């Protein structure tokens, strides 16, 4: 059936891919393996070709679901698998069907025997109704097409022509969009519509070169009071449109997110070209999502300002101590001399003043005392007493913060919100005195020491306000206080499955522990005690392990890579052809098809040949950090506008993740990577990047030198593929991000065990990884300082008693076991990200029973791990090798990301992640290209001389000396490389 071009969803290549029969063991086993009944029906035919033809017809109706006449080609391996089951020659299929009637008779019999249904108007209506409902939830055409085919297959409906399915999906999606747009548009008033028109047509008053929409989209600069006020100005502008009254609560979250992302990409001129309902709806949904982002960004700036306030206090104290160090030392010497004189006078019953003046002149003594009084800091001093003058820097924005943002809390935190209301009221009324009955119980002891004036009753306005704003920050971060209209700072319980939902679903949970606390604690105690008993019996037999005098120490591991392996690896790399990075990327695109994942965000169309070259250039521009402008200058025939367009519309987060998954999955199916690992273990490590622009997401960390930066946190499999990456704050603990990568990568890797450095672990992460079924194995620095725990009494293990310094609180685990499982289940099912919830659990104000219980469960796992770690040198080596692979990956990453002195120049975290993802794709492309050509080199070595297969375990596919990263960038789309026509080795 021919369909209107506007309703085509697929390219010819995509249609072929949908109808292709994969040579997949799972597909063969599930759909093409015949039962005894199947064989009885097949064998009713006398001729071999008819038996095989009938069997093949049955097989393809099961999968992919089209009639035999629609299938253009069937892989030889599939024909062989089917023919072997029925005992005929595969070649007999060439003679089927001799008569066309035979083919149709067979199809009719299959329909009758197996209850297959022909696709008629009735099936069309049923499927369309199903698709329409799905399209209200997800507008992705490819997703809907997959769902459509799965639905028909599940209901044993024979698939019609794929163009019919395309038209049905197109119409269902169009009808769903029309319904959605009409619903949203109808709930808008004429005044709201006029305001929406205004933001895409009117220029911003103070920025004549920008529309109001362009102004609203501006990324924030560095966290400062001025930036805060600019964000609030935009937030209040959107609030002034009263869009909260628009009816969108019944719309599916996924669909809202898709439309919001589209809204963020469209320029004002594009909106003006849309039909009214579509224009108003997408704008409204985008602006409502933008209010959440602006609310979160505003509070994030407050978070940073409080951190900056406290940091400046600490630095001021350090500076005082540095400046006064010499004088303080002088006073200590005076005190020592005077003290010794006084002791002598008392013991020898001498005149105190004469003895005193013998060591220090009286006037000098008086001056020293006066100077000491000036140098003296308050008893139990910290730096908070130095913050009095810093109060006014907060006042630049905090009245606006308290006026614009609305806070809610549980009853336990009402005193804090009462204090917020008091300060808000004082700001509005202009009163300067804090009421005497203002709540103070929620304020920490540190702040309370500075809360009152010298009379002991009058509350100091400056310190009260700073204390309240600091406590507000902590409680919001912890989830005890929520912000109305926020996405990131909601009530803690809102992130989890409700107790009712948990009780209904916990029978099907994917957690790795028993739902019964008694079963859980019995099993863990048994594992715990088994390790302790073994170590107690064998502690003297472990090489490189010392447990003397209550100190646990390990000898440094010797390198285990033989020199022969290094020479062998070098000899293989010498055989690899030199190649430009542009050609390498095109080779890998031809071989893997990863570029096809860059579908257009608006119309879902895959890139054509010309667009593919533009995408490759944009990938290099971002992944090498030279930028799109420089890339356009260095690439003949391409312009900046072309690169900017594909980066905006094709290289969005979901497309980048899918392209990355294609590469990782392809690499995982090759043979050579299995010498390096089986794809079940991985490591993660951060690569700190300097930021060359002011950004809300930039942090300073003295550990990494001067300047502010962000961290690319990368996950590396044991096969040298980079399967997940994200941007995190430099001062964020790596540990809280570990589970994001393990749970949310989209590859075929089945990661069971994960390694990190010391920064990658906390007790709570140990607990959660166990609950979610992962083995967690960090390399712990200063192992001798680690606190080991026991469930039973440490005295039961006298040889180990000195290193067992704590006891697990099983009572708190028992009391909170259900809630801990509910938390873990919520993370596993994606209700909340692990990093978000772990950040809240790590906040000091949320050290409640749930956080404590998870920490205690983690201490069990950490202790078991450390016992295994010191008992097993092979485990220590495995962790070391895993981390070395991540470090090697970072080495390659830095070589590729050479532009702009390796600095990120993007302000928003989304654009920073786009650069990091492009870098990851290039890394994986290099790993694949090297692996393929190293495989060819290995095969050549096997044919031409002696060969030690064990040396392959020590290789890496991350070498880059043969790859030209520099120069003018040409992309040759005419030279098509395949697995059967790789570039020739360099043998001379």
From Swiss-Prot:
The keyword Transmembrane helix does not apply. Signal peptide: none annotated. Coiled coil: none annotated. The keyword Glycoprotein does not apply. InterPro entries: DUF4158 (IPR025296), Tn3-like_transpos (IPR047653), Tn3_Tnp_DDE_dom (IPR002513). Keywords: DNA recombination, DNA-binding, Plasmid, Transposable element, Transposition. One of its GO terms (molecular function) is transposase activity. It comes from the Bacteria. One of its GO terms (biological process) is DNA transposition. Pfam families: DDE_Tnp_Tn3, DUF4158. Required for transposition of transposon Tn1546. Belongs to the transposase 7 family. This is Transposase for transposon Tn1546. It comes from Enterococcus faecium.
